Amino acid sequence: VYKRQKAASAALLEDEKLLGEFYTHSGLTHSQTLMPMVEQLLSCCRVNLADIDVMALSAGPGSFTGLRIGMAAVKGMAFAQNTPCVKVSTLEGLCYNLPEFSGLLCPVMDARCGQVYNALFQWKEGQLLRLTPDRAITIPDLEEELKAYPQPILLLGDGSLLCHQTMQLN
């Protein structure tokens, strides 16, 4: 389950196969959208909550209120079913969409005030390697750090346009 600002998503996987996912970017609050979205996802996939082996949730970074609502919902469902629950960095999760990219993955989320939430990753032999911890960093500081990497750099996330417009990278 991922909740950030107005965006929310839920996905259901079996082994590594995506069975279904829901995404919304509405004006409704997270408390109004999350549980109906999860219920509809389970219904469409014909899966009962009791059949789920493990639940994962976004651990941020992101909006404190949105993360708190997502965590409370997932932990509540997991507790009720005695199901293990794991947290996933939102920044790391973004990188799993690009397992074939051979350069530097630079997920960025707008943290406001000229900063982005960021971490750096790269794939090596089928494994995602974390090069930096999740952090809040100014765009000029990130730009300076990225100059040290000779390989292609891919910006991804809701802060990518902001960074692209601000940075002077080759």
Predicted features and spans:
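DPxDG-like acidic metal-binding loop motif
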Residues: 56-85
